[in-house]
Amino acid sequence: MRLIRMLLATALTFSVIPAHADGKDVARLTQLLEKSQTLTARFSQLTLDGGGTQLQETTGEMALQRPGLFNWHTDAPQEQLMVSDGKKVSLWDPDLEQVTIKKLDQRLTQTPALLLSGDVSKISESFDITAKEAGGVIDFMLKPKTKDTLFDSLRLSFRNGIINDMQLIDSVGQRTNILFTGVKANESIAASKFQFQIPKGADVIQE
């Protein structure tokens, strides 16, 4: 559930391009994000406390489509599902047989998943952005411009122009690392993937 809440809420020496904050970094990140209108992938997520102790490890699969559609399915160790139809988000917990439905917060600082599936044309209004490149991997560090956020910093890493991993660090130093594998971009995704059907007999909570 921590991954879902946070998303609502990612020895060798190389020649490194120093981090710098300018319009080129913003434009490059925006271009990389916007060129993938859909994404599907497996993910593995690891959460560590401020001292580096492992708190949680989960795996699953995700599907994203612009603007604002996503399906984030955690399959182990505990199944959970988060689905956005662009207007509302449904959180399904099979163990509790409970669905929580809430309005989708369009602010990128409150819903990190929208960085991969939403409108990022005004990303510089929400974040200070710096970039560095090493060994064919481009890292973008995003620092929220306001304090009313779910995280203190977010790193997005791209390999060969495709999202490879992301890391979120919260106010107490906990790190959530998400690695994507088998990434496929700009392939057709069934509309039903982003429409959550409430299971019969499930408890429904509207927020």
From Swiss-Prot:
- What processes in GO biological process is this protein linked to? lipoprotein localization to outer membrane; lipoprotein transport
Please name every pair of cysteines joined by a disulfide bond in this record.
none
Q: Which Pfam families match?
A: LolA
- From the UniProt annotation, give the residues forming the signal peptide: 1-21
Q: Where in the cell is it found?
A: Periplasm
Q: Which UniProt keywords apply?
A: Chaperone, Periplasm, Protein transport, Signal, Transport
Q: Record's Gene Ontology CC terms?
A: outer membrane-bounded periplasmic space
Which superkingdom heads the taxonomic lineage of this protein's source? Bacteria
Q: Which InterPro entries match?
A: LolA/LolB/LppX, OM_lipoprot_carrier_LolA-like, OM_lipoprot_carrier_LolA_Pbac
Give the protein's function.
Participates in the translocation of lipoproteins from the inner membrane to the outer membrane. Only forms a complex with a lipoprotein if the residue after the N-terminal Cys is not an aspartate (The Asp acts as a targeting signal to indicate that the lipoprotein should stay in the inner membrane).
Q: Which NCBIfam families match?
A: lolA
Subunit comment = Monomer.
Recorded family membership: Belongs to the LolA family.
Q: Which PANTHER family match?
A: OUTER-MEMBRANE LIPOPROTEIN CARRIER PROTEIN
Designated name of the protein: Outer-membrane lipoprotein carrier protein
Gene name tied to this protein: lolA
